[in-house]
Amino acid sequence: MLKQHKGHPLARLWRALPEAVRLSPHIYMMAASTTGQWLILGWPERVPEADEVLPPEPPAYRVLTGVVDGFGRTLAFHRAAEGEAAGAVTGVTDGAGRRFHLALTTQAQRAEALRKQRATSLSSPAGPRSASSSSAFPDTLPAGTEYGTDNGIRLEAVWLTHDPAYPDEQPTAPLARYTYTASGELRAVYDRSGTQVRGFTYDAEHAGRMVARHYAGRPESRYRYDDTGRVTEQVNQEGLDYRFEYGQDRVTITDSLNRREVLYTEGEGGLKRVVKKEHADGSITRSEYDEAGRLKAQTDAAGRRTVNRLHMASGKLTSVILPDGRTVRYGYNSQLQLTSVTYPDGLRSSRKYDRQGRLAEETSRNGNITRWFYDSPRSSLPGAVEDGIGVTRRITRNRYGQLRAFTDCSGYMTRYEYDRYGQQIAVHREEGLSIYSLYDSRGRLTGQKDAQGRETRYEYSAAGDLTATISPDGKRSTIAYDKRGRPVSVTEGGLTRSMGYDAAGRITVLTNENGSRSEFTYDVLDRLTEQRGFDGRTQRYRYSATGQLIRS
């Protein structure tokens, strides 16, 4: 069908679909929402040719072949037609025309690659003389798992193979790379520089059970499980540890500071919800849900109940009744977009949308009106904004939606440039004022240079923490961190400030450049209760049952 009746709730969204998709008899479409995306479901293998006299029977199932947004941009999935990976997604084309290749491997290919790696290592004079330390890597995986059949196919790398903005640039390395254990579990993730950024360890006796994980440059977190596979302990180096105890519809969580929380649950499967929470200070909060698992009421630690009224069909929030009886009401249009909010004092804010469902006008509760203008019916982002006093600012974007130029109310224009990774490499302001940015292979900002050639440089740790800033005159300021990435000292101009933390990551002491100290104390809910200043004076804080500061 080329067109839907104009009164149909999906009529506008239907027009956003490519004509070939709308007219195809072999494609199913499913709308995620009245303003959102179409999910395109096609044949799992080949599509019958138009001239086939007796086309084959329709398939028993359909696979996701694309996602079309409300402006006609398509995210297309390309699947392997043959081989061991037949039917698997091996390519993606995004709405801007960029093409990505998903490199897949089988268990046998990974095993062969490891054998070649071992052979090369053994033949190298500097390599080990025995491979006995390496565990066996089988050519196949067990056919059946508790999640179904495992064909052993895994994602090895993601490559950007074509970028319309940079058609002549060919990739030399993948955007991301993945390695796996002999059991097919994800072992490590590498970024485009080849640096490992994530690592995982698994239980040798329980396939797929993760027992440790870490980020680059950060300490490892480890997990222990009970006989049913539930986590019973999480151990975090240089941080808080947690113990988990499971009862009937109850989970008790105790940290290494001996703080205890209890979560009480109701429901089963995907509808299980936390209906009561006992906090470390003994206070209790409650939550209520409807049959669909949607939040309908909450009671705070002081016993005050807030009620959410939901639309029976859409589930949209229509009103909130506050503990004192005051009500906030919400209105929607036929596309289920928020159009109004009426506050307890009678004031009202409102929104208007254009035919494409884009925000066109917003009136605040004090009467100020902001308007948005778009360059074309297929633009999802505004090209101009007019504020409450009639001042207009213009915005130009590149094909990827990034800000390319901004013109303020006086006509002053600022222009922006980006590299192929989407990183901002230049900002050009009026009168020749420009800033140029440099990045390393991991995408971290390493330098900024102005139009006069004055450069500021930046250095980082393996974890990505900024460790040094070198100004154009050569002066160097440094920041030191603990293993968890928290700054423990800042040195600038030969003077140092330092910070100390407790196991929960709360700052407990500040030492300034002349050695004076400021100390901090907290309660079991991490609220600041006492501060001893650099001058030696002490200030204390008290809170209500709901966490509001009531005395200082």
Task: Identify the residue ranges that each predicted region occupies.
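Extended charged/polar low-complexity repeat regions
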Residues: M1-S552
